[in-house]
Amino acid sequence: AREMAKEARERGLLLMEAMISTLSPNFMKLQEKISCIGTVRHYFAAFCQYSSKIDLLRKIISGEESCPVPSSFNPDHSGGATQDIGIYTIYPMVTLFGKPESVKAEVTAIEVPATEGPRRIDTQASVVFRYPGMSASVLYSKAADSRLRTEISGEKGSISLDQIHITRQAEMIVRGAPTSGRSEGAKPEDITAVCDPDEYLCEFREFIDLILSGRTESVNNSLDNSVAVAEIIDQIRAQGGIVFPADA
């Protein structure tokens, strides 16, 4: 990622990571409203989705099946939960708050067949990050389901999203506001933005806008953000003992 970013900048080329989470109308709404909740003290995001391939993977490991390991769990393809879905919890965090001071990961992994012999591949992880004056934590899994909401907590209130990878609903609670607070009967404010029927259009729209305006970097999906996220993912993999053939 670092080499690609350097090459793109030196040659004046447009390069943008196709990260939908940080280009969606609801993420933009979050950025617009985040000052309303005061100084942020914690960020939490979860993306847990039981993979349709994990049952097949278990049969391959046990010898019941002899087919190739699915790409999403294949070390030869640099697969695993962190690379596949964990990034959707981490990229928005970096876009909002920058690179953390520290990363502490608890990684669950299994051994799967690979070209150069069995290798560990991560199926889920929980990660804690430290920032000046705040903390962040993420949870992601391809081996379990969860309906946990994403929440950004501040001194004056909080903002929650139904899901972090493609946000379709967002709400805000500001302490003392007429529509919110902790009093009986108070309701959070719905801050959901109008979205396209096809959520992925926001990625194409951002890229086209960059081309038409002559810019070579997205603000939210900047090269600095992409490099920072790649470095965080490397730290998580290192702490979990996840090594790919492509790392050589």
Label the model's feature ranges.
Residues 191-205, 221:
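Active-site loop of classical SDR/Rossmann-like NAD(P)-dependent oxidoreductases
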Residues 1-22:
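Beta-strand-loop-alpha-helix segment that lines the small-molecule cofactor/substrate pocket
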Residues 150, 167-184:
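Short polybasic amphipathic segments
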Residues 89-169, 205-213, 247:
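Contiguous beta-strand/loop segments that form the cofactor/metal-binding neighborhood of enzyme cores
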Residues 10, 206-248:
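C-terminal helix-rich "cap/oligomerization" subdomain common to oxidoreductases
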Residues 21-106, 115:
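Predominantly a Rossmann-like dinucleotide-binding segment in NAD(P)-dependent oxidoreductases
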